[in-house]
Amino acid sequence: MARAVHRSGLVALGIATALMASCAFAAKNVVVAVGSNFTTLDPYDANDTLSQAVAKSFYQGLFGLDKEMKLKNVLAESYTVSDDGLTYTVKLREGIKFQDGTDFNAAAVKANLDRASDPANHLKRYNLYKNIAKTEAIDPTTVKITLKQPFSAFINILAHPATAMISPAALEKYGKEIGFHPVGTGPYELDTWNQTDFVKVKKFVGYWQPGLPKLDSITWRPVADNNTRAAMLQTGEAQFAFPIPYEQAALLEKNKNIELMASPSIMQRYISMNVTQKPFDNPKVREALNYAINRPALVKVAFAGYATPATGVVPPSIAYAQSYKPWPYDPVKARELLKKAGYPNGFSTTLWSSHNHSTAQKVLQFTQQQLAQVGIKAQVTAMDAGQRAAEVEGKGQKESGVRMFYTGWSASTGEADWALSPLFASQNWPPTLFNTAFYSNKQVDDFLAQALKTNDPAEKTRLYKAAQDIIWQESPWIPLVVEKLVSAHSKNLTGFWIMPDTGFSFEDADLQ
């Protein structure tokens, strides 16, 4: 702050040589405009990718995923798995400290995994860790994690953004308020959180990786309106913005000071239908609604071409994803099916969205118009993060008002189980996880469970295909599109990326 005041004084005096020197040491402060607000800074208690992405400012895990969603070591050096698949032994890096000076060691890992795997803590990400039987600190750099049953995707759970290492001293000090007081091993530490406006983080001078971070601060600013985010880039109010309004992508691409990036994605957009409620308990109704939506037109209208029509319930870039013949747009067929289902004049329903940004609202409007053409009157509501948490994620089947729900999912572990189980397994109805269709099929449950007990790729392929075949046939969803991730940044900002799961990679970020 003193540096900035000193610089402005020199400008006022008009001392050119001093001005040049001060510019050379100008603070590297970056503003990132994002599409919605943050729910918490505790990764274990965040259901949304954005909150977990911002938490990466402070936190790191034992493992992580690179830009290709491949596993990489972070705070861990290596791991081994026992022959029975029940025990994971992890070797840790030495000499790392948390931002409060506490040592990072095996005891810290145990404290975090004990907290995460204890149902009494009621953490939203508990389901990721409920298979942990016990965690033991063998010595300061060795952790042994024993599972209740074999879980072949467990190492990907340890790479999930939720599996952050929090200072055990901070956990002891702040308890349930840790979401407001993040203390990790990451490159930045908390400066300010104005819960209605921004999160600002500043360089952690004791960061363990030499020469990093290169930025002095990052301000994460929620901006719901797509056009405002784009305008902030053009005026220099922000140096990075995501998501970029698709209709403005071409305009931004012409700006010589801005670089536009369209990245591969594992973000699947869909509409779930509550199959426990009429009329969505009728398979013919669900089939009709799939015929009622013109997906190629939706790609153009809402996504300006930056998406592809969905060909399954798992994005193609996820291992073991199955592709099917896309649903054709056939409103005549849709009306015939509705008549056979006992709804010759259609019906009225509600369609909620998990987000309220401009693209989500376009999807709602487009879908509302498409449904109207087959006699379905849908009242639409675009929710903010607080509404979504209260009305969708926080209510069970009996209390839920969810009927049709437009949302998206990215399997942040990079593997098939997390692309399927949270969304279709019977035990994962809200408020447990995100099966907002309240879908239940015993065969699907069995196939998903069996797939986690084998490390044989051929057997996994068979089991995941069998599960997806049933889900596709029973249609608890209207699969819509797989997005392309469109972001933009100032050309002098380097090393700042969007991950395929819509998270951020910014450890090497710098302002030139």
Curated annotation (Swiss-Prot):
Identify the InterPro entries for this entry. Peptide/Ni-bd, SBP_5, SBP_5_CS, SBP_5_dom
PROSITE patterns, per database record = SBP_BACTERIAL_5
Example GO BP: dipeptide transport
The GO terms describing molecular function are:
peptide transmembrane transporter activity
Keyword field: Periplasm, Signal, Transport
> Where primarily located?
periplasm
Q: Does the keyword Transport apply?
A: yes
CDD domains in UniProt: PBP2_Ylib_like (cd08499)
**What intrachain disulfides are recorded?**
none
From the UniProt annotation, give the residues forming the signal peptide: 1-26
Task: Determine if DNA damage is one of this entry's keywords.
Answer: no
Q: Which domain of life is it from?
A: Bacteria
Question: Where is this chain's protein located in or outside the cell?
Answer: Periplasm
Q: Which GO terms describe its cellular component?
A: ATP-binding cassette (ABC) transporter complex; outer membrane-bounded periplasmic space
Which family does this protein fall into?
Belongs to the bacterial solute-binding protein 5 family.
Q: What is known about what this protein does?
A: Part of the ABC transporter complex GsiABCD involved in glutathione import. Binds glutathione.
Assembly state and interactors?
The complex is composed of two ATP-binding proteins (GsiA), two transmembrane proteins (GsiC and GsiD) and a solute-binding protein (GsiB).
Descriptive protein name: Glutathione-binding protein GsiB
Protein's organism: Escherichia coli O6:K15:H31 (strain 536 / UPEC)
What gene codes for this chain? gsiB
